[in-house]
């Protein structure tokens, strides 16, 4: 049964190709039989169209390996002529499978690329949100309240000085007001408190001079009183 099918296949190839009728290459018949045994698509040896469309490369490879001299080219030309007589295109099932596999691998790689870009954009948005949260949480600055409390304590201590230093204390009050109006700048508060300390220290010699003058005046009054008292006692004795 198998021999009858092979014979019918050979006859059909010989009838379909004029070149085969003239010089029938034996290697072409052998290659068709060999490829038909190992083919999973073409299950019959007389299906010329099946070999043309699905086993073209297998037939060509077989012809190049077993046909001597230049018979491989002649045999392949006869095979193509048979395919054109059947209006069959030359193709391969293995090449179509490999092309579909490559297209599926390209699709999977593009899917991976899109998913990785989506994850990277998500990471970027979350990091920007966390950085904005940190920036908003660090916007508070408690240094202004400390500066104002220091200024108030300095001004209260300056009010206990001698009355002769009123001008300097008023100057200190005005400078402390200027410092409190600019309490947002820590360096300006420090500079104004330094000026206030220098003003208070300059007021101290003035109050000391007033106290010493008052002491000298008190001594003169006591001496004058003693002189008057001695004169009165002398007058009474006389």
Curated annotation (Swiss-Prot):
Cystine pairs: 27-67, 31-62, 42-50, 52-83
Principal subcellular localization: secreted
A GO biological-process term: fungal-type cell wall organization
InterPro entries the UniProt entry points to: Extracellular_membr_CFEM_dom
Superkingdom per UniProt: Eukaryota
Cellular component annotations (GO), alphabetically ordered: cell periphery; extracellular region; fungal-type cell wall; mitochondrion; side of membrane
Glycan attachment residues as annotated in the record: 87
Location of the protein in the cell: Secreted, Cell wall; Membrane
Domain CFEM: 23-110
Cross-link position per record: Glycyl lysine isopeptide (Lys-Gly) (interchain with G-Cter in ubiquitin): 161
Keyword DNA repair among UniProt keywords: no
Record's comment on post-translational modification: Extensively O-glycosylated.
Biased composition (Low complexity): 93-203
Region annotation Disordered: where it falls in the sequence: 91-203
Propeptide span(s): 218-238
GO molecular function, one term: structural constituent of cell wall
Keywords in alphabetical order: Cell wall, Disulfide bond, Glycoprotein, GPI-anchor, Isopeptide bond, Lipoprotein, Membrane, Secreted, Signal, Ubl conjugation
Residue positions of covalent lipid attachment, annotated as GPI-anchor amidated glycine: 217
Family statement drawn from the similarity comment of this UniProt entry: Belongs to the CCW14 family.
Role description: Component of the inner layer of the cell wall.
Protein name, per record: Covalently-linked cell wall protein 14
Organism: Saccharomyces cerevisiae (strain ATCC 204508 / S288c)
Gene that this polypeptide is encoded by: CCW14
């Amino acid at each position: 049964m198998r021999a009858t099918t092979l014979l019918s296949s050979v006859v059909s190839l010989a009838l379909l190709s004029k070149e085969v009728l003239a010089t029938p290459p034996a290697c072409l018949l052998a290659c068709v039989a060999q490829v038909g045994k190992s083919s999973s698509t073409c299950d019959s040896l007389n299906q010329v169209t099946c070999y043309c469309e699905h086993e073209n490369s297998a037939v060509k490879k077989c012809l190049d390996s077993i046909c001597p001299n230049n018979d491989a080219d002649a045999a392949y030309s006869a095979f193509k002529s048979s395919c054109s007589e059947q209006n069959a295109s030359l193709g391969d099932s293995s090449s179509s499978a490999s092309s579909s596999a490559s297209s599926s691998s390209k699709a999977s790689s593009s899917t991976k690329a899109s998913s990785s870009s989506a994850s990277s954009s998500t990471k970027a948005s979350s990091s920007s949100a966390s950085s904005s949260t940190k920036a908003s949480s660090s916007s508070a600055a408690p240094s202004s309240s400390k500066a104002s409390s220091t200024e108030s304590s300095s001004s209260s201590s300056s009010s206990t000085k001698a009355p002769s230093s009123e001008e300097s204390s008023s100057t200190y009050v005005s400078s402390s007001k200027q410092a409190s109006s600019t309490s947002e700048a820590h360096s300006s508060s420090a500079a104004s408190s330094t000026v206030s300390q220098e003003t208070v220290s300059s007021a101290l010699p003035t109050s000391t001079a007033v106290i010493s003058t008052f002491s000298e005046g008190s001594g003169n009054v006591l001496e004058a009183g003693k002189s008057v008292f001695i004169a009165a006692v002398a007058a009474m004795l006389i």
